[in-house]
């Protein structure tokens, strides 16, 4: 879906009436700034009875006349051609009564605009419609007093049935009120390219709406909303009022004679090569016909959206296919929405960072997948939100970047359930709220939150060797040298806090998705494994720290099963709840090894601790020592009888100690500390309760 923007009492919003369908994730190849052979055709009025008059005065084209609606608030123009060369000005003449100026281009050629578009004499919104395509060159600029929209729609609707048609006749007198629909009769719809610097005034809105939209230049709407959207062909886009969503109606609007419209827009490659001249657009067409942005390896297809530089109060970028963000700088003081029917693709480079900073909520949805790789700039966190940060997909969420949220952070599927994510190189997540995700598979992971953490199964596959973790991070060594997992909930101070001015956040009410499910500052995850199946590579340490409760399934930092000759060491397992309870009864806690050494297991809670089997062992007779197992409950009880209910530290050499200390009752199964060269001490101490070992042996 696309989010909404305010425009002097009108909200422009675009959304799908149904879930975006799943489409192929495959992309062609992309590349960067190149001179594109396009030539601006002069501004020529259409001879169709609309009454548009164009007067040339040096480099300025004064646009007057036209047709008015019956209430004189909407002014309509019709052009055979509309283009500007460098240094030229299109001057739309208005008056204080005119709220909207709408211009159409009917000649069948794309508009090549490499000069200035302005409105004088009134504070009118300006709509420019050319179904054949619109190109803003590197020298394109705006000087408009209100909102601006460029669209390749074939019609702009007023009310339920009145249309400003892109071709044919119009009943201008009946086109009253505010434009609220946009018809795209052609498939694919025409393309829009912006290589210029398009800027509207403070509080005004800027919209680029087409079949494919590529903005390699700058778009700015300080205090207003930017919408950049590629829509499917043969759709009707409806404008909604605040609080509602807009639909893409499945119908094929025709012209008044019932015939298909008389042009076929050029695709992106045809638009770039078909009209001669030289306008810098930031695009090139390869010999195989693929369109490329400079400096990347991802191509641009029909219905894609590409955006490079966006600055606004709020912004929505929405693609009917892929949303491609290469070296982009996207900055809003309010919400930022990044949406794709297929894939949201993000890349930085060694030369240029990727930045998506939202003063309020940052929402990223790729229906098929989210593909993020932005690790080249250690000093700058790519994804930062003052409010909540959401990554939503029914496919894989690949998050090789650092994420910092001033609210909660959630990785979800389209149904709102926790979504799975992977990272091949380096994920760091920091949230001033809750963190929610499904299963994780990837390299060493750190998640820190002032709220709670809820996750699925976690598999750590290697150390983080990307070089993108700041050396100032207190877990730098663990993360960069081992298969480490670090989950920290209920923190008062984040190691990697979001860096946004407080004024950007405003009065956002941050939502806590876990507040009804877990006590604040809790951790609940599925099975955890940091085990290594590669000889000579140790298993990673596991650290879970929370203010509230901690609940887990299996917790494995052992050498992988079946690797009998592995000389790996197991990792240490540390689970600490500063104010709640610990429950690992749904699985085993295992820090065993084959030939190497077993890891230490430490469980410490303010309240009760409930466990199943706890293992630190060494299998082979030529192996090392087993680790210590320490369980401490400061104000609660300890019960280790779930499942098999065993506590074992066993090794052919020495074993560690076993220590259980609680304020309340202690109930155990079998406890063993057995080593050929000496077993460790077993200590069981209850300060105010009873000790029951009847369920096993010591």
Where do the model's predicted regions map?
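Extracellular and secretory-pathway beta-repeat/beta-biased strand scaffolds
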Residues: 2-698
């Amino acid at each position: 879906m696309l989010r909404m923007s305010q425009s002097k009492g009108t909200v422009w919003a675009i959304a799908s009436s149904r879930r975006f369908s799943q489409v192929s994730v495959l992309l062609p190849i992309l590349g960067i700034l190149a001179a594109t052979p396009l030539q601006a055709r002069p501004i020529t009025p259409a001879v169709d009875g609309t009454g548009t008059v164009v007067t040339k005065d040096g480099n300025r084209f004064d646009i007057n006349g036209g047709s008015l609606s019956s209430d004189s608030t909407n002014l309509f123009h019709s052009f055979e051609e509309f283009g500007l060369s460098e240094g030229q000005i299109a001057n739309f003449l208005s008056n204080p009564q005119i709220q909207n100026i709408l211009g159409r281009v009917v000649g069948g050629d794309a508009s090549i605009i490499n000069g200035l578009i302005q409105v004088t004499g009134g504070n009118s919104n300006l709509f420019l419609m050319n179904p054949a395509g619109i190109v803003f060159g590197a020298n394109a600029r705006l000087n408009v007093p209100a909102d601006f929209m460029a669209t390749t729609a074939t019609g702009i609707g007023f009310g339920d049935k009145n249309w400003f048609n892109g071709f044919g006749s119009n009943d201008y007198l009946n086109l009253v009120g505010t434009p609220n629909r946009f018809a795209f009769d052609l498939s694919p719809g025409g393309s829009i390219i912006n290589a210029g610097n398009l800027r509207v005034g403070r509080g005004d809105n800027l919209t680029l709406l087409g079949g494919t939209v590529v903005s390699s230049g700058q778009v700015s709407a300080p205090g207003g909303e930017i919408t950049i959207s590629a829509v499917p062909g043969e759709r009707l886009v409806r404008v909604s009022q605040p609080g509602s969503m807009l639909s893409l109606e499945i119908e094929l609007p025709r012209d008044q004679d019932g015939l298909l419209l008389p042009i076929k827009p050029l695709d992106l490659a045809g638009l770039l090569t078909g009209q001669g001249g030289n306008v810098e657009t930031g695009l090139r067409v390869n010999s195989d016909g693929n369109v490329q942005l400079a400096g990347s390896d991802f191509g641009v297809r029909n219905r894609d959206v590409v955006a490079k530089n966006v600055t606004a109060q709020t912004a929505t970028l929405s693609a009917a296919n892929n949303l491609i963000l290469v070296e982009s700088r996207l900055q809003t003081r309010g919400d930022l929405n990044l949406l794709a029917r297929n894939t949201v693709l993000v890349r930085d480079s060694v030369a240029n960072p990727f930045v998506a900073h939202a003063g309020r909520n940052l929402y990223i949805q790729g229906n098929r997948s989210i593909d993020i790789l932005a690790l080249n700039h250690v000093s700058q966190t790519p994804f930062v939100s003052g409010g909540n940060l959401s990554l939503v997909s029914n496919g894989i969420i690949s998050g090789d970047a650092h994420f910092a949220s001033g609210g909660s952070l959630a990785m979800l599927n389209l149904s709102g359930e926790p979504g799975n994510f992977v990272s091949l190189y380096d994920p760091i997540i920091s949230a001033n709220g809750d963190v929610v995700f499904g299963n994780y598979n990837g390299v060493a992971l750190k998640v820190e939150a002032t709220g709670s953490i809820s996750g699925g199964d976690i598999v750590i596959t290697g150390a983080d060797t990307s070089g993108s973790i700041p050396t100032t991070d207190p877990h730098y060594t663990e993360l960069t040298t081992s298969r480490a997992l670090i989950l920290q909930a209920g923190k008062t101070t984040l190691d990697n806090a979001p860096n946004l001015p407080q004024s950007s956040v405003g009065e956002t009410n941050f939502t806590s998705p876990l507040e009804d499910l877990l006590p604040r500052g809790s951790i609940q995850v599925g099975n955890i494994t940091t085990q290594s199946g590669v000889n000579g590579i140790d298993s990673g340490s596991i650290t879970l720290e929370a203010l509230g409760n901690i609940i887990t399934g299996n917790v494995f930092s052992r050498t992988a099963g079946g690797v009998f000759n592995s000389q790996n060491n197991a990792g240490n397992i540390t689970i600490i709840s500063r104010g709640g309870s610990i429950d690992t009864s749904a699985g085993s806690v295992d820090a065993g090894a084959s030939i190497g050494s077993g890891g230490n297991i430490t469980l410490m809670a303010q309240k009760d601790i409930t466990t199943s089997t706890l293992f630190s062992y060494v299998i082979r007779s030529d192996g090392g020592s087993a680790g210590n197992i320490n369980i401490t409950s400061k104000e609660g009880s300890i019960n280790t009888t779930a499942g098999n209910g065993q506590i074992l530290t066993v090794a052919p050499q020495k074993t560690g100690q076993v220590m259980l200390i609680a304020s309340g009752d202690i109930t155990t199964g079998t406890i063993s500390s057995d080593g050929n060269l000496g077993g460790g001490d077993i200590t069981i101490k209850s300060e105010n309760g009873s000790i029951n070992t009847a369920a096993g042996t010591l």
